UniProtKB/Swiss-Prot annotation:
The keyword Disulfide bond does not apply. It comes from Brucella anthropi (strain ATCC 49188 / DSM 6882 / CCUG 24695 / JCM 21032 / LMG 3331 / NBRC 15819 / NCTC 12168 / Alc 37). InterPro entries: Ribosomal_uL14, Ribosomal_uL14_bac-type, Ribosomal_uL14_CS, Ribosomal_uL14_sf. SUPFAM superfamilies: Ribosomal protein L14. SMART domains: Ribosomal_L14 (SM01374). GO terms for cellular component: cytosolic large ribosomal subunit. Keywords: Ribonucleoprotein, Ribosomal protein, RNA-binding, rRNA-binding. Belongs to the universal ribosomal protein uL14 family. It holds the Pfam family Ribosomal_L14. Part of the 50S ribosomal subunit. Forms a cluster with proteins L3 and L19. In the 70S ribosome, L14 and L19 interact and together make contacts with the 16S rRNA in bridges B5 and B8. The keyword ATP-binding does not apply. GO terms for biological process: translation. GO terms for molecular function: large ribosomal subunit rRNA binding; structural constituent of ribosome. This is Large ribosomal subunit protein uL14.
Length: 122
């Protein structure tokens, strides 16, 4: 469950390390984002010579949340951290690699490029 002011790790090699959610997209009163949702983020920490720099405002897809994700079969999946992948305006990832596992729920939200780059899909 991601809301405004939530700090997230970045799970790709775009050059950002930490980002802060500044808006949850999808409706004027929408408060929370879950896995697969698109949010607007501000880069809070970045590595030198990366594709992005500190202070940039970008869109990102939430790929891991510490809050439980309920599946239709009754099982529950949760992660140790909140993480996102930076995307461009065409919803393509900016980085060329994804770090860490991502859940199957991204497939239902049509983030196939992230699924294909991920080392493990849970």
């Amino acid at each position: 469950m991601i809301q405004m002011q939530t700090n997230l790790d970045v799970a790709d090699n775009s050059g950002a390390r930490r980002v802060m959610c500044i808006k949850v997209l999808g409706g004027s009163k929408r408060r929370y984002a879950s896995v697969g949702d698109i949010i607007v983020v501000s880069i809070k920490e970045a590595i030198p010579r990366g594709r992005v720099k500190k202070g940039d405002v970008m869109k990102a897809v939430v790929v891991r949340t510490a809050k439980d994700i309920r599946r239709p079969d009754g099982s529950v999946i949760r992660f140790d951290n909140n993480a996102a992948v930076l995307i461009d305006n065409k919803k393509e990832p900016i980085g060329t690699r994804i770090f860490g596992p991502v859940p199957r729920e991204l497939r239902a939200k049509n983030h196939m490029k992230i699924i294909s780059l991920a080392p493990e899909v849970l």
